[in-house]
Amino acid sequence: MEHSRERGRSSNMRHNSREPYENPSRSRSLSRDPNQVDRRQPRSASQIRVPNLFHRKKTDALIVPPAPKDICPTLKKGFLCDSKFCKKDHQLDSLNDHELLLLIARRTCGIIESNSQITSPKDMRLANPTAEDFSQGNSPKLTLAVLLQIAEHWATRDLRQIEDSKLRALLTLCAVLTRKFSKSQLGLLCETHLRHEGLGQDQADSVLEVYQRLHSDKGGNFEAALWQQWDRQSLIMFISAFLNIALQIPCESSSVVVSGLATLYPAQDNSTPSEATNDTTWSSTVE
């Protein structure tokens, strides 16, 4: 009897001694001791929040549309073009795989000798020209009249042998003259460009995008990107086409502007037959 009572007492003592460790959360008080120091682990460097103000802005390179290509039909047929009067594009990158393989096959057989000229690379310093590259010297003031004289002069020149600094300056001239056009006339400028170069409508989007981005270009960033990413031959073709058409198409389409400026046209002058005919046609359209 006493032995069973002692055994029951010892089991109760073991149970009571084990009870505080069953649930440790019970022993924690809800009220925090004010004298207790809160020792938290310091945040790692990856957890520290940095204000967005100090994040450096990412500046990606400008995406330039592909240059319009008018591939030489002789080259597309697999023959090397040896004509000195052909003004089409002769870049082999413009050919598809079939046309390129056909050209290689004919070339390796020795049927046609190559007379193609390899264009020299552009001076990439001129993508962002400095004052030394375009020193003004004693040049006249750049008025609208001077811009037109420069455009008329270079519209009739062959640009294939021109030096890089002048070609870069002509690209700037095209950008400046493009901004003299009304934004509504950029579509007409694109259509005239396609007709002048004999390009298909599949090239219209690229040409129109170039004119639109030159028109809204701030700081010459897109102009510099064109110089960097287009090859020399594409730049020459684009500049030549622009200089030939820019002085021939209207720069304004607003009927109010056109009718208002038409009244300011000088009176008929019979000094030369060409001027007289031009005045006659103008006056007839105005009336």
From Swiss-Prot:
Q: How is it modified after translation?
A: Phosphorylated by host. Phosphorylation negatively regulates the transcription activation. Phosphorylation and dephosphorylation take place in viral inclusion bodies and are largely influenced by the presence of NP. Dephosphorylated by host PPP2R5C; this dephosphorylation enhances viral transcription and is mediated by NP.
Region annotation Disordered: residue ranges?
1-52, 268-287
Q: Name one Pfam family in it.
A: Transcript_VP30
Q: Which GO terms describe its molecular function?
A: RNA binding; zinc ion binding
Instruction: Zinc fingers (C3H1-type): give the ranges.
Output: 72-90
- This protein's UniProt keywords: Activator, Host cytoplasm, Host-virus interaction, Inhibition of host innate immune response by virus, Metal-binding, Phosphoprotein, RNA-binding, Suppressor of RNA silencing, Transcription, Viral immunoevasion, Viral nucleoprotein, Virion, Zinc, Zinc-finger
Where the protein is mainly located, per its record?
virion
Positions of region (RNA-binding): 26-40
Q: How does it assemble?
A: Homohexamer; hexamerization is essential for RNA binding. Interacts with the nucleoprotein/NP; this interaction plays both essential and inhibitory roles in viral RNA synthesis. Interacts with VP35. Interacts with host STAU1. Interacts (via C-terminus) with host RBBP6 isoform 1. Interacts with host DICER1; this interaction prevents TARBP2/TRBP binding to DICER1 and thus allows the virus to counteract host RNA silencing.
Q: What is this protein's function per UniProt?
A: Multifunctional protein that acts as a viral transcriptional activator. Promotes read-through of an RNA hairpin in the NP open reading frame to enhance viral transcription. Mechanistically, nonphosphorylated VP30 hexamers form a ternary complex with the viral leader RNA. Clamps the RNA template and the complex VP35-polymerase L together, thereby increasing the polymerase affinity for the RNA template to increase transcription initiation despite the presence of RNA secondary structures. Also assists stop-start transcription at gene junctions to promote transcription of downstream genes.
Q: What family does the entry list? A: Belongs to the filoviridae transcriptional activator VP30 family.
Q: What is the protein name given in its UniProt record?
A: Transcriptional activator VP30
- Gene source species: Reston ebolavirus (strain Reston-89) (REBOV)
Q: Which gene encodes it?
A: VP30
